[in-house]
Curated annotation (Swiss-Prot):
NCBIfam families: thiol_BshC. This is Putative cysteine ligase BshC. Its EC number is 6.-.-.-. The keyword Coiled coil applies. Residues 460-484 form a coiled coil. HAMAP family: BshC. GO terms for molecular function: ligase activity. Signal peptide: none annotated. Keywords: Coiled coil, Ligase. Belongs to the BshC family. It comes from Bacillus thuringiensis subsp. konkukian (strain 97-27).
Length: 538
């Protein structure tokens, strides 16, 4: 593996944040400097955490996932007041979801290791699985290449239930068939059998989406020391009850903090991402197997436009009795993470970084400071045949990231012809239209009754010219079919559906191509935190 860095243009909050723009950096409590991380350690030492209860839960949960010894030791280390975490989170995508989930975990592992060395304190890596998520459409699919097209392959469970990812039971037989169909789209390699066995081992131990995700991730990173947490685990929810109560008692201040910070964001020229009602309580409650967002209505906590209603006392009582019924929304999830974990740094993608910039005053309302927010490492893999295609087309490795691949293809094709087809036909149509306009005027003067027919005649001529243009383009493309297929392969591999590779393709393809130690070998590479994109030649 060979790694290179390229500068890829970014936009909005992320671009300005990484470029050191002071205005947007002022929306975060810490700069990404070594002094800031030292200050963060000092700030965390002044706070109290329920470390022992957390350790007890995490030991039980990670042991069930068959965690390696390094993970168990890291969990135990969390009981020490001088241990901190680097954390990131994601939904429980089937087969681990898009590649960026893996890249988030790699980011967490690398930053935890670096900060432990530079700060001289114990830093452990934590990955937060968003188990409370009810949106199965976000996690029930993956993308494959089939018949020279990119296809979204959805897992249709025969017994779908309206439940969270932590509670949604998987039909193992259905899921196994779905996985086999996906692997049929991959080339048969020396690794295929082992990878299928690797995946099936995790599936057999799983009852839910979160189980399957957790087993796969733990198996993939078994020697890394990674700690997993299911955000919707009933035992974790019990530990979170005091903070749920605090949110309920301060929901108006939370909403005001969000509103005020979003006004700051607007004044800086950015468009806020988080959308909430002014009476939002920012907590979900599970009612009749449905996740219902609570709102304030004249001192009552209501859901579904008043279908459900609770007094403050009733809500607190229910939190104490059934904490597993409650979960956070986009505003309070980061707060709960801050309450539970002594967070040295949070690692997020571009979207997360943007919405965290709207939360500064929300954190302050609760009496917290936002942890340092570090943009995750971004990676694209270039396989040998794709590198050959780039070379054959005289393209640089950075070209597909800086330019639209379709545009690169069009430019290449036009360079194969002395005069661009589009330009020549536009010119021809213009000349013919001028001639025909004059001809129509002549016809009208002699026989006005033929004016309509003359107009149709012009339309027919245009149709024939466009047909000729299409046929010419088709023949030119056929002549250069070999080269144009190279562009298609580049597009599919590096910019599928016009998106970054890591937002579409799944890690199983690469495990199948390069072996079960693929992720371990990627983790051996030195990644930088300078905001540049990492390209790995395989």
């Amino acid at each position: 593996m060979e790694i290179k860095e390229i500068s890829v243009p970014q936009q909005g909050v992320v671009a300005d944040y990484m470029n050191g723009k002071k205005e947007i950096q002022s929306c975060f409590d810490y700069m990404l400097t070594e002094d800031a991380f030292k200050q963060r350690v000092q700030d965390l030492r002044e706070r109290e955490f329920f470390r022992q209860d957390l350790v007890t839960h995490l030991l039980e949960y990670n042991t069930k996932l068959q965690a390696g010894e390094a993970t168990i030791q890291n969990v135990k280390a969390l009981g020490d007041e001088n241990t901190y975490v680097v954390i990131a989170g994601q939904q429980a995508g089937l087969l681990t979801g898009p590649l960026y989930t893996i890249h988030k975990i790699i980011s967490v592992l690398q930053l935890a290791k670096e900060k432990e060395e530079s700060l001289g304190v114990k830093v452990v890596p934590v990955f937060w699985i968003a188990g409370e998520d009810h949106d199965m459409d976000e996690i029930n699919h993956t993308f494959v290449t089939k018949n020279k097209k990119i296809k979204k392959t959805i897992f249709h469970d025969r017994n779908p239930k309206k439940a969270s990812a932590s509670e949604s039971e998987l039909s193992l037989e259905d899921c196994r068939k779905w996985i086999e169909e996906i692997f049929k789209t991959y080339p048969e390699t020396n690794f295929t059998k082992d990878v299928l066995q690797f995946v099936d081992d995790s599936l057999r131990k799983s009852n839910t989406y979160v189980d399957f995700f957790g087993h796969l991730i733990m198996k993939m990173f078994v020697n890394s020391g990674l700690i997993l947490v299911d955000s919707h685990h009933p035992e974790l929810r019990k530990l979170e009850v005091p903070f749920f109560k605090q949110i309920v008692s301060k929901y108006k201040e939370v909403q005001e903090g969000l509103h005020n910070q979003q006004e700051v964001i607007k004044e800086l020229g950015y468009k806020p991402i988080i959308e909430t009602k002014s009476n939002a309580v920012h907590i979900f409650m599970e009612i009749d197997n449905e996740r219902v967002l609570l709102e304030d209505n004249q001192g009552k906590f209501v859901g579904k436009d008043g279908t459900y209603s609770f007094s403050y006392e009733e809500l607190i009582e229910e939190m104490e009795r059934s904490p597993e019924r409650f979960s956070n929304n986009v505003v309070t999830r980061p707060l709960m993470q801050e309450y539970v974990f002594p967070t040295l740094a949070f690692i997020g993608g571009p979207g997360e970084l943007a919405y965290w910039s709207e939360l500064q005053q929300v954190f302050h309302t609760i009496g917290f400071r936002m942890p340092p927010v570090v943009p995750r490492i971004t990676i694209t893999y270039i396989e040998r045949d794709i590198a050959t295609d780039l070379h054959d087309l005289q393209l640089q490795e950075r070209d597909p990231f800086l330019n639209n691949v379709d545009k690169l293809r069009e430019n290449w094709l036009s360079n194969q012809i002395e005069e661009p087809i589009d330009d020549r036909f536009v010119e021809a149509k213009k000349e013919i239209m001028n001639i025909h306009t004059s001809l129509q005027q002549f016809v009208k003067e002699i026989d006005p009754g033929l004016s309509a027919f003359a107009g149709k005649n012009e339309f027919k001529i245009n149709e024939q010219i466009e047909l000729l243009e299409r046929m010419l383009k088709r023949n030119v493309e056929k002549k250069h079919e070999v080269e144009l297929n190279k562009f298609r392969r580049i597009q599919f591999a590096l910019r599928p559906l016009g998106a970054p590779q890591e937002r579409v393709w799944n890690v199983c393809y690469y495990l199948n191509q390069f072996g079960l130690d693929f992720v371990d070998r990627v983790m051996e590479k030195p990644f930088s935190w300078n905001g540049k994109h990492h390209v790995i030649k395989l």
